[in-house]
């Protein structure tokens, strides 16, 4: 099972943690997106959108990290713990996954990605969207140890990757006590946390280098 990735990518780190939780071995194929490896014809043939992460399992190619995570659990999970089969429980996990993609991570991208290109962050309005995203997450976690039920699911793992990316960029999680409590626990119970954090540190290093270069 070939896994095309960059350790810096939040989505890539999500899949790595899910695979570790399942005990699934990935054949890691590093792509250097800064060198445009993702645009090479052999990769575009696998994924016309030329995005990472991309998984190729016995000739079946799938991309988008949350889709990959669910696929791995559905195919290789010994049970449905990480992605419940019960329709209501599954719907809640899916809602949190979509929240991560469309709200939480989106707010990160809009505020912090400009640092990579211009050396300056997004607008004050963009930062307010981050704050509102965390306010929502804080509400979701009221009285809860996990984001979608009473145990670890793929939703926790995806959101853990995103929240750790915010932390490495010095976003203050302590303003959101439920999130901070959840995060402290999630780091302890999620397989592959150390690898996730290492990738987040690497991502911050790339941004810092670009920001310094932009100031020269």
Swiss-Prot record:
GST C-terminal domain ranges (all copies): 86-207
A Pfam family hit: GST_C
Binding site for glutathione: 50-52, 64-66
Keywords for the protein's UniProt record, in alphabetical order: Detoxification, Transferase
Signal peptide interval: none
GO biological process, any: response to toxic substance
Limits of the GST N-terminal domain: 1-80
UniProt keyword annotation of Glycoprotein present: no
Catalysed reaction equations from the record: RX + glutathione = an S-substituted glutathione + a halide anion + H(+)
GO molecular function, one term: glutathione transferase activity
One Gene Ontology term, aspect cellular component: cytoplasm
SUPFAM superfamilies in UniProt: GST C-terminal domain-like (SSF47616), Thioredoxin-like (SSF52833)
The keyword Transferase is assigned to this record: yes
Enzyme Commission code: 2.5.1.18
Family per similarity comment: Belongs to the GST superfamily. Delta family.
Function of the molecule: Conjugation of reduced glutathione to a wide number of exogenous and endogenous hydrophobic electrophiles. May be involved in detoxification.
Subunit structure: Homodimer.
Protein known as: Glutathione S-transferase D5
Species name: Drosophila melanogaster
């Amino acid at each position: 099972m070939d896994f095309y990735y960059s350790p810096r990518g939040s989505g890539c780190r999500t899949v790595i943690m899910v695979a570790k939780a399942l005990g699934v071995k990935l054949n890691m194929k590093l792509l250097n997106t800064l060198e445009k490896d993702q645009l090479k014809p052999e990769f575009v043939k696998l994924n016309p959108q030329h995005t990472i992460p991309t998984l190729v399992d016995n000739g079946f190619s799938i991309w988008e990290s949350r889709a990959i995570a669910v696929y791995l659990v559905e195919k290789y999970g010994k049970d449905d713990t990480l992605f419940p089969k019960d329709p209501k429980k599954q719907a809640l996990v899916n809602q949190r996954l979509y929240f991560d993609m469309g709200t939480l991570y989106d707010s990160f991208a809009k505020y912090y990605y400009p640092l990579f290109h211009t050396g300056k962050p997004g607008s004050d309005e963009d930062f307010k969207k981050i704050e509102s995203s965390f306010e929502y997450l804080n509400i979701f976690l009221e009285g809860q140890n996990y984001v979608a039920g009473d145990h670890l699911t793929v939703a926790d793992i995806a959101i853990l990757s995103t929240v750790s990316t915010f932390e490495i960029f010095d976003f203050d999680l302590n303003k959101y006590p439920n999130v901070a409590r959840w995060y402290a626990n999630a780091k302890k119970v999620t397989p592959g946390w150390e690898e996730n954090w290492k990738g987040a540190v690497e991502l911050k290093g790339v941004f810092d280098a670009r920001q310094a270069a932009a100031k020269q």
